[in-house]
Amino acid sequence: MDNIKVLFLGDVYGKAGRKIISDHLPIIKKKYQLNLIIANAENTTNGKGLSWNHYQILKQAGIDYITMGNHTWFQKQDLELVLNQVDVIRPLNLMQDFNYFQLGKGSYLFSLNGLKIRITNLLGTSINLPFAITNPFVELKKLVLTKDCDLHIVDFHAETTSEKNAFCMVFDGYVTAILGTHTHVPSNDLRITPKGSVYITDVGMCGPGFGSVIGANPKQSIKLFCTGERQFFEVSNCGAQLNGVFFEVCSKTNQVVKIEQIRIVLDDEKYLANDYFNLVE
């Protein structure tokens, strides 16, 4: 039996994210002989949520399973349709009285090449949704104790590096992979932990390039930091980047035998043409 080869793609953000995945994923899949492709798609539609049309685009590009995050519930016109797809996994740790608790699932168990594989999506406590979420540490421990799978891949969608590091300390060796998402900035700490789990604080995003502020129009972000004025962030149209984590698992031992960070950056001249100095007053 061949080893399981997995690719996890960071937060898909807007048109740039959809396009770079559609253009490059077939090449990556062939190069790495992938068995399983997972992507966090919570920012796919205008930076917030996932529409039915964009769900179909990601599926056509070759993504097998989709995880979500704190923007899961923004595309309300398609919410029930998208979340009830068998391959879409929304955050697990929701309060039962949360409005959308009944839609979708937070963890999914399936078989691949004779192995039972579970994918789980969790929101960190550092995500400011106190009215909606339960503790991710407690919820994952409950799930781990069921011991119902050979491989367990966790998308931990959290704000702070400290919470993600603490999460890794708790679940090192109890799950196959802990893949941080949400901040859109790839961290430089991909590793196989002492007890054998894949860990990275943040995978990064698949979206606009360096001419954006984590995917958004820089003018609006700069204004927020200078004046405190909040407004809807437009998705930047400057360049593109793809960030992902590849890992290979031995099908005989269920141990991770190889990891690699995948990064493609396609920036353009729009970045050089912009000068934001005078936005500061």
From Swiss-Prot:
Active-site residue list: 71 (proton donor)
Protein name: Putative phosphatase/phosphodiesterase MG246
Species annotation: Mycoplasma genitalium (strain ATCC 33530 / DSM 19775 / NCTC 10195 / G37)
Positions bound to Fe cation 1: 11, 42-43, 184
Disulfide bonds: none
GO molecular function annotation: 2',3'-cyclic-nucleotide 3'-phosphodiesterase activity; metal ion binding
Keyword annotations of the record: Hydrolase, Iron, Metal-binding
InterPro entries, sorted: Metallo-depent_PP-like, YmdB-like
Short name of one Pfam family: YmdB
Keyword Nuclease in record: no
NCBIfam families: TIGR00282 family metallophosphoesterase
Binding locations of Fe cation 2: 42, 70, 157, 182
Cofactor field: Fe(3+)
E.C. no: 3.1.-.-
